[in-house]
């Protein structure tokens, strides 16, 4: 099966985990876009959504899904998002779409976090893809130097401003053997808004699209 077909497969499967009438959190990315397509055919299943990005918000509004402000709802039962990489412990690298900070906030709020991805995103050790860091613009040089000290190769993501008005540094050349430790270390640098390691708050369930069907990992 082609990658896009695998993404559609998990996008359809995750519907089984939605409580009818609930407000759900929705992330950002190509696999999530397929999930939003699925929602367009069953939009009465949910009451509305909390969105992690302006892009996803626009897509959801286009199909008539009400958008809720996270700060104005009492609880969020479910958050559905994709990943750039995911390891066997369900820790992830996310942020290729520059929405990592809002994704982290929604993930931290949700009772359950389901990651939907195709099998190409599975790795034993995180770090094959660059690790995004959202930073305050004036901290760019400082944080780049700190990243070099820990063995990373920082690269400024040109022509990208996040929905929060910040910039992104992508970090190459990392072999992330202790994701929680690295997440905490990078978050401690002044000027870091958020790092795209989802290790402390990892996924609760992963639905992985494979050529033999959907693999469910807890």
UniProtKB/Swiss-Prot annotation:
Q: Which SUPFAM superfamilies match?
A: D-ribose-5-phosphate isomerase (RpiA), lid domain, NagB/RpiA/CoA transferase-like
MF (Gene Ontology) = ribose-5-phosphate isomerase activity
| EC number assigned by the record | 5.3.1.6
Provide the active-site residues from the annotation: 103 (proton acceptor)
- What pathway is this protein a component of? Carbohydrate degradation; pentose phosphate pathway; D-ribose 5-phosphate from D-ribulose 5-phosphate (non-oxidative stage): step 1/1
Binding locations of substrate: 28-31, 81-84, 94-97, 121
* InterPro entries cross-referenced by the UniProt entry: NagB/RpiA_transferase-like (IPR037171), Ribose5P_isomerase_typA_subgr (IPR020672), Ribose5P_isomerase_type_A (IPR004788)
Q: Organism's domain of life?
A: Bacteria
Is tRNA-binding tagged as a keyword?
A: no
Which residue spans traverse the membrane? none
Q: Name one GO cellular component term.
A: cytosol
According to its UniProt entry, the protein's GO biological process terms are: D-ribose metabolic process; pentose-phosphate shunt, non-oxidative branch
List the catalysed reactions. Answer: aldehydo-D-ribose 5-phosphate = D-ribulose 5-phosphate
Q: Which UniProt keywords apply?
A: Isomerase
Q: Give the enzyme class.
A: isomerase
Family listed: Belongs to the ribose 5-phosphate isomerase family.
Q: How does it assemble?
A: Homodimer.
| Xref: HAMAP family | Rib_5P_isom_A
- Role summary: Catalyzes the reversible conversion of ribose-5-phosphate to ribulose 5-phosphate.
Protein name stated in the entry:
Ribose-5-phosphate isomerase A
By which gene is this protein encoded?
rpiA
